[in-house]
Amino acid sequence: MCYMKSFLYSMAGCILLYTPLDSLGQLNNNKKQSLLSYVDPYIGSSAHGHVFVGASVPFGAVQVGPNNINKGWDWCSGYHYSDSVVKGFSQNHLSGTGIPDLGDILIMPYTGDIRTTTGSQQDPLSGYSSYYNHADEIVSPAYYSLVKSDSVRVELTASERVAFHKYSFPSNKNA
């Protein structure tokens, strides 16, 4: 009987020792997936969503992002997914409100001659506006990037109180 108790205690000890080690191995084999893969930053940026696309953080004082030429109520956030013309990048946007406001401190990096007007949707190149393609956009929380049709790369990021702009110009063009 004594041998039987010893054997059972030994087996129970082995099981208790092996189980936590085995589960640790399983935890290490699980691939970590970023929660950002579940975020679609374009949600609400078309139709009547009025959501801006750009860089911001929760409860941040700045919402830096692109501005399209305003063609009506659907553009009140400054950006509409259906558009292909950007007129600049501003520090503040209202998102999802249904009322146009903010769009403060508009900055537009561009190449070529100095232009002081926005241009039009039909002829954006008559002013400082530029064409762009969504394939050239990178959008994620707190980061926005775009390569405009004049090959100027715009990168925007935001913290709680500060927006940071980085512009990279092609070396073969006047900027």
Task: Give the ranges of each region predicted by the language model.
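Bacterial Sec-dependent N-terminal signal peptides
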Residues: 1-29
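Accessory carbohydrate-recognition regions in carbohydrate-active enzymes
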Residues: 26-175
